[in-house]
Amino acid sequence: MPEVILAKSAGFCYGVKRAVEMAQQTAEQTGGCWMLGDLIHNTHVVEDLARRGIRKAASPSDLKAGDTVVIRSHGELKSVLDDLEGRGVHCVNATCPNVCRIQMLVAQAEQEGRQSVIIGEPHHPEVVGVASWCRHALIFDGPEAVKMWLSEDPHNREIPLTVVAQTTCIQKLFESSWEILKKECTNVKIFDTICNATHKRQTEAAEIAGKVDVMVVVGDRKSANTKHLTEICLRRCRRVLQIENADELSPDFFNGCSVAGLTAGASTPAG
């Protein structure tokens, strides 16, 4: 058996742990409640929550007056929240506080007449939700998209910009993106909104991957931060495997391996 180096940062991050606990408490208090979509990006945890009386609504229209719904850790569209509350649906906001901060930064930028720029995955629920807190956010998935936008119109360089990041964005990708904007544009405010847990997890994963023969990353395939951990590990280790559970591991993967590394995404429980 190879020696195994386990990442100390593995396990639920604060925001995910908080959302799961809030959902469980709400279900106990109400005798059953709803989550709108997946509360977190972990199929096994979502299935466990369903067994505890937390049903999944596929659409806001599935909820009626008097229902209680727990808002997922990634946040929700502002228009959806306004609609639910307007129809008498009780919303328990389990949005990660770090995501709430980004929502407020974007809303404040709107009030100040500034253009919001989000560095992250355009279709990720967190990014889509954050973008809804202003009229029109620019979403860039990296420095190449930033360069393309700048090349479209010379006047873009004169627009007052407020730049934020998806909480699970890769640190180097965010930095390389805002550095271009800071260099090329005349009025830029930059907020590093990558959460500390994400930064710590990414740094530790890179350190471990550089010391091992093989690296295993555990997390749901829908999880952005798990995908990013895998990408980071691949830069330091040639043999990296992303799995959702131990059943996906094959003994053959560890052939010739003396030291193996193990880390996990923020939506993966430690136990």
Residue ranges: model-predicted function:
Residues 1-271:
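The feature marks the mature, well-folded catalytic cores of soluble enzymes
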